Amino acid sequence: MDAVELARKLQEEATCSICLDYFTDPVMTTCGHNFCRECIQLTWEKARGQKKRRKRKGSFPCPECRELSPQRNLRPNRLLTKVAEMVRQHPSPQSRDLCQVHRELLKLFCEDDQRPICIICRESQEHRPHRVVPIEEAVQEYKLKLEEDMEHLREEMMKTEKLQAKEEHTLAEWQEKVKERRERIMVEFEKMGLFLMEEKQRLLQALKKEEEETVAKLQESTASLKQQSHSLERLLLQLEDRNEHTPLQMLQDMKGLLSRKSSLSVQYPEATSIMLKTICRVPGQIEVLKSFQEDVVPDPSTAYPYLLLYESRQRRYLSTPMDGTPCGKDRFLAYPCAVGQEIYSSGRHYWEVGMNLTGDALWALGVCRDNVSRRNRVPKSPENGFWVVQLCKGKRYAPAAFPPTPVTLAEPPSHMGIFLDFEAGELAFYNANDGSHLHSYTQPAFPGPLQPFFCLGAPKSGQMVISTVTLWVKG
């Protein structure tokens, strides 16, 4: 007996003749036949309902040989349980070709349900209205479909492989570009570092030369004045001494003394300018600061009643000065001032202000505490919560500190930049036109939140432009 036949025999032995499936909890009747416990009990229950009379109480006919067997004498068949389990775990190829319901060969294919069926299934109500074809025909049809699908998948695989190769090439190209850019950044910053070092040395040398020239002029003037002072002192002593002599002695050689006095008139030295020509300008600094630039907008509710705020994009006034302007607690009443809507308590911030002012128009720019006095005239100093640069007289721009350290400029700035580093406690002012540094406030920390601060002087003194808002005082 070959292996296939042996497997078939085992399947037959492990199959219940009632349910035509492998045994589940098999039991043996007194006549020696085996059935699933549930199958034989259901069969006998059905027989009990159909036949009210039995030849022997508690006995039922065997479904195989019809011999009566007492229901109590059903014995578990443990060996058959193991055989059924083995067959269930290792079905033969032929068993897989059998219908699980009817144990018939699967010779047909249901197109509607897309699964093989047997001849008995074909006649069932479930499959009778369905399109059914021989399984060989279905195999040929689906083989063609599978070939088409496989060909399509092969083409898609080729496309995927090409795309993968392209992406890998792109990745390598990208990494090479990043490498080159990283090296370029290193080189350029190294060059910039050298350039900045050279520029620093150039500025320091220019400043030193300017210092030496001015010091030499001032020292020369000082020496000349000192010499004149000594000559005048000697002549004064001679005159004092002559004044103490007798009248005749005093009048001797009076003409010579008086002529010497006339020749010793003070020679005033030429005025030496102490306006520094060497500008503190770091190349590229303004461009770096612009990376922190923000649109600062003046707050109309804080503006002095006669301070006009005009929004150029919206083409409208943000505030209309009039006698009946509401005077809230945030509005400035002592000076033509306003603060920005922004409140800064951290971070770095940069903004610019355009200056279109006339003559010696007074103004102030910077930051202030959010709780500064707005009703009373107080000095705009850090002690009062103001960190500003303001115009004093002529072209002198004084930081509002005590004592003030005026900065004299050749030309008034038409565009100023303000940089705030809150955590560092630093506020710096720049001429945005040429990038030169004007002044810095440096302290351990600011005492609290800050707001941009803008102040103008008398009417018709000019305008300030902050972002898209123009400020001026109504005349």
UniProtKB/Swiss-Prot annotation:
Subcellular location: Cytoplasm; Lysosome
EC number, as in UniProt: 2.3.2.27
Gene3D superfamilies linked to this entry: 2.60.120.920, Classic Zinc Finger, Zinc/RING finger domain, C3HC4 (zinc finger)
Domain B30.2/SPRY: 275-473
InterPro entries: B30.2/SPRY, B30.2/SPRY_sf, Butyrophylin_SPRY, ConA-like_dom_sf, PRY, SPRY_dom, TRIM/RBCC, TRIM17_PRY/SPRY
Function: E3 ubiquitin ligase that plays important roles in the regulation of neuronal apoptosis, selective autophagy or cell proliferation. Stimulates the degradation of kinetochore ZW10 interacting protein ZWINT in a proteasome-dependent manner, leading to negative regulation of cell proliferation. Inhibits autophagic degradation of diverse known targets while contributing to autophagy of midbodies. Autophagy-inhibitory activity involves MCL1, which TRIM17 assembles into complexes with the key autophagy regulator BECN1.
Full protein name: E3 ubiquitin-protein ligase TRIM17
Protein's organism: Bos taurus
Name of the gene: TRIM17
